[in-house]
């Protein structure tokens, strides 16, 4: 299971093993879902409606956007910003899962609450994600800038991007969009962890005995379900975060349509509602849900997989 397990036969991995499992989980997952992330970011940053009826809209559907990006920018465009994204995923995965395991253990040892309860997983998952976000947010800003830029490129390399952004916008640029990120990530990650745990219990209750034997499939399906639920409920805040992160970067967005400036989170929400309507809060939701299902499913799948590998290694070593 994910989180502290007080049962005597529960996994007893070291903190280093937990961090490594989280890092590898993030690395593999990021490589697989990067194309969906690029499409999602392009949709979120487009001010025009995602519709064929709008002649100014550059993108209006997942398949159309995929074809257009492939034709205009080549296959590698789907992995734009992949290096900062991988740094983000490796660091984020390590800090998030390590924090979650430590927090749930702390709750078990220092309170009367059951570390496996929905509410405990929600709070610990949210706090773990906030800790990870504070650690890697500058890399997230870099990833968004790389994924958002068109042709010709504004930033050629990671080093060039860091230097240019620092000189032109100051050190605070690396924490743009932090407020909506923290506001969004707490309930999102909290729901990921708590829904994953609840769906696993539901799966065990609903499935016949034969179906319970395939634990890897269970982890993948429950993780995917948790990703869809959490992303749907918190999506508008993710859109605000992306819009704010590209502030000061408007010249590189000119090829994609309208460009707007926002004074902050509330101003961003107000402008989106006034100029794009309530549906504007959910631009890019379809590729985002697909990405959330795959990324969360793979995240928990690979994390549980590698934790089990380390557990088997530990047990074998202790028996020698």
UniProtKB/Swiss-Prot annotation:
Motif annotated as Substrate recognition, chain positions: 241-246
GO molecular function terms listed in the Swiss-Prot or TrEMBL record: antiporter activity; thiamine pyrophosphate transmembrane transporter activity
Gene Ontology, cellular component aspect: mitochondrial membrane; mitochondrion
Positions annotated as Solcar repeat: 13-106, 116-202, 214-309
InterPro entries from the UniProt entry: Mit_carrier, Mitochondrial_sb/sol_carrier, Mt_carrier_dom_sf
Major localization class: mitochondrion
One Pfam family named in its UniProt record: Mito_carr
Record's subcellular location: Mitochondrion membrane
Residue list for modification Phosphoserine: 51
GO biological process, one term: thiamine pyrophosphate transmembrane transport
Topology in membrane: Multi-pass membrane protein
Alphabetized UniProt keyword annotations: Antiport, Membrane, Mitochondrion, Phosphoprotein, Repeat, Transmembrane, Transmembrane helix, Transport
Transmembrane segments: 19-39, 87-107, 122-142, 173-193, 220-240, 293-313
Catalytic activity: thiamine phosphate(out) + thiamine diphosphate(in) = thiamine phosphate(in) + thiamine diphosphate(out)
Similarity field: Belongs to the mitochondrial carrier (TC 2.A.29) family.
Known function: Mitochondrial transporter mediating uptake of thiamine diphosphate into mitochondria. It is not clear if the antiporter activity is affected by the membrane potential or by the proton electrochemical gradient.
Listed name of the protein: Mitochondrial thiamine pyrophosphate carrier
Species of origin: Macaca fascicularis (Crab-eating macaque)
């Amino acid at each position: 299971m994910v989180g502290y397990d007080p049962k005597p036969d529960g996994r007893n991995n070291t903190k280093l093993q937990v961090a490594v499992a989280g890092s590898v989980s993030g690395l593999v997952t990021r490589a697989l879902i990067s194309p969906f992330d690029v499409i999602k970011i392009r949709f979120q940053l487009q001010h025009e409606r995602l519709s064929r009826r709008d002649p100014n809209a550059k993108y209006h559907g997942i398949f159309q956007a995929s074809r257009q990006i492939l034709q205009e920018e080549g296959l590698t465009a789907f992995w734009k910003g992949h290096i900062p994204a991988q740094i983000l995923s490796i660091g984020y995965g390590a800090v998030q899962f390590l924090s979650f395991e430590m927090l749930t253990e702390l709750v078990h040892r220092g309170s009367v609450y059951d570390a496996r309860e929905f509410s405990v997983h929600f709070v610990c998952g949210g706090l773990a994600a906030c800790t990870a976000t504070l650690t890697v947010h500058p890399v997230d800003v870099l990833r968004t800038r790389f994924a958002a830029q068109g042709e010709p490129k504004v930033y050629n390399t990671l080093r060039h991007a860091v230097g240019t952004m620092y000189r032109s916008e100051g050190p605070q640029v690396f924490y743009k969009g932090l407020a909506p990120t923290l506001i969004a990530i707490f309930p999102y990650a909290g729901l990921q962890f708590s829904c994953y745990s609840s769906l696993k219990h539901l799966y065990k209750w609903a499935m016949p005995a034969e179906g319970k034997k395939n634990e890897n499939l269970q982890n993948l399906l429950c993780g995917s379900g948790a990703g869809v639920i959490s992303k749907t409920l918190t999506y508008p805040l993710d859109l605000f975060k992306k819009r704010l992160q590209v502030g000061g970067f408007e010249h590189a967005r000119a090829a994609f349509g309208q460009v707007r400036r926002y004074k902050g989170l509330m101003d961003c929400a107000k402008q989106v509602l006034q100029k794009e309507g309530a549906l504007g809060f959910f631009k890019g939701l379809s590729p985002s849900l697909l990405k959330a299902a795959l990324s969360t499913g793979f995240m928990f799948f690979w994390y549980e997989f590698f934790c089990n590998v380390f557990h088997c290694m530990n047990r074998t070593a202790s028996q020698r």
